[in-house]
C-alpha cells in the first residue's frame, strides 16, 4: 500500500485505518462489506508531505521554497529552469511533479492526461456511522462518485468528482436528506481542484520525466494518487540518476522510465479507466440493480472482504468472475469489459 511504499518511519500523519465500505446506489440500495484487517489509511496530507520533506532533507536534498518555476528550456545537455525574480537553475535531468496543471510538461510537448475531473471536498463535524468504513454514493455526479471518509469519531471528509462544476454538484449532494441530517456543524476545511485520469501516451521528453498528477498517475476507480505517484517517483529517481551519471538526458534514454512505470502500473490504470467509463454509462436503474444483486450474494461479499485491494483491483475482479451465478451474467460482462 501507499504507507509501505512511502518508507516513512513516522506514521503520525495517519488519521484512521479503513477496513470496509458502504456503497449506496442512486435509489438507496446499500452494499456493506468489511475486512478483518485494514485495507486503506486516511492521512493528513499536510503532515504526510511534511514527513516526506523531512526525510528527504535528512538524505541531503536541497530544497528551495517560494521558487516557482516559470519556464523550462533545453540548452545543449542541460535543462534551464527559469525561477521567479530572474534566477535560473541548471540541471541535466528534471523530474516534474508539479501537479495536475503540468505546465512544464506541456511546455516540453508532453500531452495532458486524458481527462481532468472537477473535484470538491469539505471536512465537517459529522454523525459517523462506522469510523472504520467509508461511504461511496454512486450517481451523485457524472464523473466518479461521492464519498464520505471518516477522519475521526465525529468528523468526516465529504466530497465528489464530476465532469464539470464539482462545487455545484457537492452543494447539491450535501443538501440530500441522507447527508444533511448527519452534518453537525460548519465545514472546517474546503478543498477544490482537478483530478487527472488517464496517462498521456508519453511521460518523458529530452531532459525531463513527469510523475504523479501531471502524468495522470491516479487510480480511476478511487481517485487516489499517493500510491501510484510514489511507485512512479522511485522509478523516475532511479532512471534519472543513472542517466545523469551516463551524461545522457535524451528522450530515448529516459524512455526507460516510461517502460518501467507502465509495466508496474499501466494495466491497473487502464482497467480503472475502463471501469470508470463503464460506471458512467450505467443508468441509475442499472446501478440500483447491480448494488442490489451484490448485496444479496454473501459469497461475493466474502470474496470482496478477503481479496479487495484498493491499489490493484483487477485481482478482485478476476476472483469475482468465479463466484457469479446466472443472475450475475450482466456483471460478468461488465467485469470482462473492464479487464479487457
Predicted regions and their residues:
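FAD/FMN-dependent oxidoreductases across multiple families
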Residues: 71, 88, 164-245, 251
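Conserved N-terminal helical subregion
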Residues: 16-17, 22-107, 114-119
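A short, flexible beta-alpha/helix-coil linker loop
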Residues: 30, 38, 154-156, 215-218
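C-terminal helical "tail/cap" subdomain of flavin- and related membrane-associated enzymes
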Residues: 241-340
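A short, compositionally biased micro-patch
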Residues: 16, 26, 75, 84, ...
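Conserved FAD-binding catalytic core of PHBH/FMO-like flavoproteins
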Residues: 100-175
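N-terminal FAD cofactor-binding segment of flavoenzymes
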Residues: 1-22
Amino acid at each position: 500500500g501507499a504507507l509501505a511504499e512511502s518508507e516513512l518511519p513516522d506514521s503520525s500523519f495517519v488519521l484512521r485505518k479503513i477496513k470496509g465500505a458502504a456503497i449506496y446506489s442512486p435509489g438507496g440500495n446499500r452494499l456493506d462489506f468489511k475486512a478483518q484487517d485494514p485495507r486503506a489509511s486516511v492521512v493528513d496530507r499536510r503532515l504526510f508531505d511534511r514527513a516526506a520533506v523531512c526525510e528527504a532533507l535528512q538524505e541531503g536534498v536541497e530544497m528551495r521554497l517560494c521558487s516557482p518555476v516559470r519556464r523550462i528550456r533545453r540548452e545543449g545537455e542541460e535543462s534551464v529552469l527559469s525561477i521567479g525574480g530572474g534566477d535560473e537553475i541548471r540541471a541535466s535531468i528534471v523530474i516534474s511533479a508539479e501537479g495536475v496543471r503540468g505546465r512544464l510538461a506541456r511546455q516540453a510537448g508532453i500531452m495532458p492526461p486524458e481527462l481532468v475531473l472537477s473535484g470538491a471536498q469539505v471536512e465537517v463535524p459529522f454523525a459517523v456511522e462506522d469510523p472504520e468504513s467509508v461511504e461511496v454514493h454512486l450517481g451523485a455526479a457524472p464523473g466518479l462518485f461521492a464519498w464520505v471518509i471518516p477522519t475521526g469519531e465525529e468528523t468526516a471528509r465529504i466530497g465528489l468528482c464530476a465532469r464539470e462544476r464539482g462545487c455545484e454538484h457537492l452543494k447539491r449532494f450535501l443538501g440530500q436528506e441522507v447527508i444533511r441530517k448527519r452534518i453537525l456543524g460548519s465545514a472546517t476545511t474546503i478543498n477544490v481542484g482537478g483530478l487527472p485520469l488517464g496517462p498521456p501516451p508519453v511521460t518523458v521528453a529530452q531532459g525531463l520525466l513527469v510523475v504523479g498528477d501531471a502524468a495522470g498517475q491516479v487510480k480511476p476507480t478511487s481517485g487516489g494518487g499517493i500510491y501510484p505517484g510514489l511507485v512512479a517517483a522511485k522509478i523516475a529517481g532511479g532512471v534519472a540518476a543513472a542517466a545523469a551519471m551516463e551524461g545522457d538526458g535524451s528522450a530515448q534514454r529516459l524512455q526507460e522510465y516510461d517502460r518501467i512505470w507502465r509495466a508496474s502500473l499501466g494495466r491497473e490504470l487502464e482497467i480503472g479507466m475502463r471501469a470508470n467509463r463503464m460506471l458512467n454509462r450505467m443508468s441509475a436503474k442499472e446501478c440500483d440493480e447491480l448494488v442490489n444483486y451484490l448485496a444479496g450474494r454473501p459469497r461475493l461479499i466474502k470474496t470482496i472482504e478477503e481479496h479487495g485491494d484498493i491499489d490493484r483491483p483487477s485481482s478482485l475482479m478476476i476472483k469475482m468472475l468465479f463466484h457469479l451465478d446466472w443472475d450475475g451474467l450482466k456483471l460478468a460482462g461488465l467485469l470482462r469489459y473492464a479487464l479487457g
